[in-house]
Amino acid sequence: MAAQAAPAEELSKLSVEETKPVSAAANGNDSNAESGDEEGEEGTTPAAGAAKKKKKRKPRKKKKAPTSQSEPPRVLVSQLFPNKQYPKGEEVEYVNDNLSRVTNEEKRHLDSLASNQEFLTDYRHAAEVHRQVRQWAQKSIKPGQTLTEIAENIEDSVRALTGHTGLEEGDALVAGMGFPTGLSINHCAAHYTPNAGNKMVLQEDDVMKVDFGVHVNGRIVDSAFTVAFNPRYDPLLEAVKAATNAGIKEAGIDVRVGDIGAAIQEVMESYEVEINGQMLPVKSIRNLNGHTISHYSIHGTKSVPIVKSNDQTKMEEGDVFAIETFGSTGNGYVHEEGEVSHYAKRGDAAKVDLRLSSAKSLLKVIDKNFGTLPFCRRYIDRLGQDKYLLGLNNLVSQGIVEAYPPLVDKKGSYTAQYEHTILLRPTVKEVISRGDDF
């Protein structure tokens, strides 16, 4: 774990006082000391003579704060933006009936007020951390790496850039990982991260979804991309990226989520990919959805389908949405399968009288370190907890903690994912996680 860097405002206070000069004799340099023969001249002693020849040291220059990110990322983002003016996301005007919002004076005033709210600064801070970490990850992820290495590289970087290692009680609730790094390969579409002892290695022919969240004060930025090294999968990745952008374009205040799903599906399923001489259609995974994001909760109350539906739920001003799409060369439908790694405490969990002592103690750890933020077993491990699985399973069975098993399509198929977080501001939608990469 990288050492925490000092904030820029603290660095600016660390001006170095001019060092008091030290005599050459005091430094052990006898050649510059006055000789004993001069002692009688004007009553000057050798020490006094030496004092006359004190050398002034040049004042040390103040250490400059970093102005660019390191590789791997270890520089606090707050140091790179000491005035907290973090970059805005992509601002997109509303279409059709919502165009009037841009010229409405009252709406502009409300948007100005919203821009000053602390939550927007926190969101942009989290988004900048996500951008810097993922852009490095896209360059650094290579075949031959273990999934554990990839996940820990991303997570260490997020913690370094937010300045919160998450090892002190409550520290991870201030800022850091919004949810565990998902590294779902090939037919596995979501909710896979390595548990302790996992030896899985990324292969040249794999298609891996990289899905991780960053939060600052509970404002979660959720964004994902897909890594593939074999160019034959390019049409699959292009289909999903284009479908996500279609969903973002369609999204807006008063827009029905069913219409967004139709727009996503139309784009997604216009693509096909050739694998082993066979042309395969790209299908939207119909039982996976986008969703709203709430304070300290990755899944809010609204969902955004990625296929056409009759869902009449409307997006509303002030909503925060994760627009994510999944494409598959398989059935276009996922089911739960495999060892669980992702968990989250339920926000609506009823109070239960726990009889198992290990469950009681683990719940305290979860409350103090994660709250309702999702976590994985590796996060519990790094807090020094052991022999907790029985207690964790008990919390799941009691309905206090939700388990999220891996979601998979049929074996032999390939899946891809792209995702952005958007804010529905009064006059524009801000694609808060947009970057030069996607």
From Swiss-Prot:
Q: Which amino acids does the record list as binding substrate? A: H191, H299
Cofactor binding comment, as recorded: Binds 2 divalent metal cations per subunit. Has a high-affinity and a low affinity metal-binding site. The true nature of the physiological cofactor is under debate. The enzyme is active with cobalt, zinc, manganese or divalent iron ions. Most likely, methionine aminopeptidases function as mononuclear Fe(2+)-metalloproteases under physiological conditions, and the catalytically relevant metal-binding site has been assigned to the histidine-containing high-affinity site.
GO MF annotation, one: initiator methionyl aminopeptidase activity
Q: Which Pfam families match?
A: Peptidase_M24
Which cofactors does this protein require?
Answer: Co(2+); Zn(2+); Mn(2+); Fe(2+)
Compositional bias, Basic and acidic residues, is annotated for 10-20
As for subcellular location, the record says: Cytoplasm
Annotated positions binding a divalent metal cation 1: D211, D222, E419
Stretches with biased composition (Basic residues): 51-65
Q: What are the boundaries of the region Disordered?
A: 1-89
This enzyme's EC code(s): 3.4.11.18
Under the heading InterPro entries, the entry gives: Creatinase/aminopeptidase-like, Met_Aminopeptidase_Type2, Pept_M24, Pept_M24_MAP, Pept_M24A_MAP2, Pept_M24A_MAP2_BS, WH-like_DNA-bd_sf, WH_DNA-bd_sf
Query: GO terms for CC?
Result: cytoplasm
Protein's GO biological process: proteolysis
Q: Where does a divalent metal cation 2 bind?
A: D222, H291, E324, E419
* Reaction equation(s) it catalyzes: Release of N-terminal amino acids, preferentially methionine, from peptides and arylamides
What's in the keyword line of the UniProt record?
Aminopeptidase, Cytoplasm, Hydrolase, Metal-binding, Protease
The job of this chain, per UniProt, is described as: Cotranslationally removes the N-terminal methionine from nascent proteins. The N-terminal methionine is often cleaved when the second residue in the primary sequence is small and uncharged (Met-Ala-, Cys, Gly, Pro, Ser, Thr, or Val).
Q: Which PANTHER family match?
A: METHIONINE AMINOPEPTIDASE 2
Of which family is this protein a member?
Belongs to the peptidase M24A family. Methionine aminopeptidase eukaryotic type 2 subfamily.
What name does this protein carry? Methionine aminopeptidase 2
